[in-house]
């Protein structure tokens, strides 16, 4: 069994946009490495790769456009995120394929850029405000991603992809 999730990876342009987000004014944040930036469409937990890939392959998912908000926000006490719109239908399609029953948690599109350090919550906010121009990227494939946890942080590896139409 492997810890898995289904994700949309950001484009190079979106990564550049995320890199430009202001880091000032936030307290107790460990900034995530760029190669971990993604939008989770469905978190699966510990499961079998082959079973999930078989389910995902049945999908017939429509491509979508992810719209990154021009701001950071705290989600729960422990995550600093960029809200993401435009992926609700794609996430619903993925979730229909990979879960036997509807998930208890609704989909809230976001891309995590920071996590809290220790048990203290993230606080503060950027003093430079919103970035003037929002950014979007096309999602033309979804990825099944393995999450390996360690004291240094999570490592994510794509173990399979499915093209969107």
Where do the language-model regions lie?
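Histidine-dependent nucleotide/RNA phosphoesterase domain, centered on the 2H-phosphoesterase fold
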Residues: 1-165
């Amino acid at each position: 069994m492997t810890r898995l999730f289904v994700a949309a990876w950001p484009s190079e342009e979106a990564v550049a946009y995320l890199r430009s987000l202001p880091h000032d004014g936030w307290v107790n944040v460990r900034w995530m490495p760029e190669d971990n930036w993604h939008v989770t469409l469905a978190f699966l937990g510990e499961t079998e790769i082959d079973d999930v890939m078989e389910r995902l392959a049945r999908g017939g998912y429509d491509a979508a456009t992810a719209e990154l908000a021009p701001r950071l926000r705290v989600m729960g006490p422990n995550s600093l995120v960029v809200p993401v719109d435009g992926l609700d239908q794609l996430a619903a399609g993925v979730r229909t394929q990979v879960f036997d029953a509807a998930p208890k948690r609704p989909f809230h599109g976001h891309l995590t850029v920071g996590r809290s350090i220790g048990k203290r919550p993230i606080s503060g906010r950027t003093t430079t405000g919103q970035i003037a121009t929002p950014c979007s990227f096309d999602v033309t494939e979804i990825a099944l991603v393995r999450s390996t946890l360690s004291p240094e942080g999570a490592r994510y590896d794509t173990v399979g992809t499915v093209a969107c139409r």
